[in-house]
UniProtKB/Swiss-Prot annotation:
Region (Disordered): 1-34, 41-60
Full protein name: SCF E3 ubiquitin ligase complex F-box protein grrA
Lineage: Eukaryota, Fungi, Dikarya, Ascomycota, Pezizomycotina
Compositional bias annotation for Polar residues: 1-10
Upregulation: During ascospore formation within the cleistothecium.
Swiss-Prot/TrEMBL GO biological process terms: ascospore formation
LRR repeat residue numbers: 147-171, 172-197, 198-223, 224-249, 250-275, 276-301, 302-329, 330-355, 356-381, 382-407, 408-432, 433-465, 466-491
Gene: grrA
Amino acid sequence: MARSRQPTRFSSEAPSESSSSTSPERAADDDTDFFTLQANDSQSSIGAGNPRDSHIQNDPETVLPPIAYLPPEILISIFSKLSSPRDLLSCLLVCRIWALNCVGLLWHRPSCNNWDNLKKIAAAVGEEDSFFLYSSLIKRLNLSALTEDVSDGTVVPFSQCNRIERLTLTNCRKLTDIGVSDLVVGSRHLQALDVSELRSLTDHTLFKVAENCNRLQGLNITGCVKVTDDSLIAVSQNCRLLKRLKLNGVSQVTDKAILSFAQNCPSILEIDLQECKLVTNQSVTALMTTLQNLRELRLAHCTEIDDSAFLDLPRHIQMTSLRILDLTACENIRDEAVERIVSSAPRLRNLVLAKCKFITDRAVWAICKLGKNLHYVHLGHCSNINDSAVIQLVKSCNRIRYIDLACCSRLTDRSVQQLATLPKLRRIGLVKCQLITDASILALARPAQDHSVPCSSLERVHLSYCVNLTMVGIHALLNSCPRLTHLSLTGVAAFLREELTVFCREAPPEFTRQQREVFCVFSGEGVNRLRNHLNREAAPQRDANEATMYDDEEELDEDEGQVTGLMHAAAINDDDYINITPPHA
């Protein structure tokens, strides 16, 4: 669709660029899109507007203040430090020069977080006699806060905005090819497009993207189930600057499209193929071999993938940039593939092998080679893993912050006692590890003796269906972990009491009655309320104990010391036991 131009208006052709943060009081919806949540290499360009009449000159006899001689780049940088749109508006009204250098900051990312705002912005964009050409000032447009309201008709005024760099339409399900195509046509500056969950979109829109958006760096079409290889191949051939590609749930995509991206888009840093169940080993091998800068590869539920995807990699290959690999539910992945992955990607930070049911201790021993690089590891439902492997993993990778061992039914207190030595552990998942007891929880709760770690770093602990746990361990955990914001105890009998479940969050609406009866998850303020309640309950008992204590405190201390010594001696008899005091950071 042809774009109309009114040359009498102010234009926003930018003589310079600034990468500084330029949007005061950003709305909540501004940072929700897939690309802006990450360190996107593409920064929105903010420039000065051009005057209506470029021949207007200042009176040569007029004495101007020094600030009038600053170049636009410096003025824009100064104005970008202002914290509110009201302050920017005040500056805009000072003089023509300030107006030209403020207006872009006000308009580059308009707040469309409610319907009234959106209507006002749309009206201003379509106004024929406005002082500025606002359509050319908008660089980021995010309509994801109005998912139920936005339709093809809503976006018609924005079809004039041909300098948009980031367009976010997440979950705007009423949009069709008509509305999205109108926004895309002529958008030569578009760098990031998020149309996730627009299930009515077809190849038509993606062909328009391929024709118009050769600067595109980020594309998120999660859930666009009607998109096929045909349009994706066109995108790969015309948008060769792509860095981030999210095809989560695009069920018709096959190796044909993925191989085309591997061949034509060498700058890809992140690719998500979750639930792309037609993708096979050939695609994975090609991506890992060809994309030297690849940082994230997500293959969750790509069930056709097996060991060959990694064993067929060239022996010399070293993917030193790869940081995240997600193989959730790739059930045919075995130990040999994990060994090859670790040797080829020695700097992996996040490794997800949840539901890779055939891996054993051998795979975990291979993961140990990642050492201090490993921060996040998910081994849920890997039921062949034993204590010895987990203990060695902790010894080798002491910077782990997140570990999930849900349904690893062979693990005992020995594993958790070793996990308790991790100085930076924030989240631990032990759901259905039914052999663990209060000894594990007391180990996690034990105060750190290392002065560099003043208190536990634990924030989320998942203990549902750990049926041997009692109030003693959990109470100690609550009091020792001030940062705790999530505690799941579903199915733990000691906590299915009405006076405690009142602090739980509501069960999800889709749960059955039986699931609701055992649901027990504390989060946010609920954790604090549970802690306070248990402490109040314990206070009378503590007072009673203090009233019957021996007068001879030295004798009592001596008895306690003997008991403590026996307990420590018993623990040390275990050859694989390590003192649970966290090591020095």
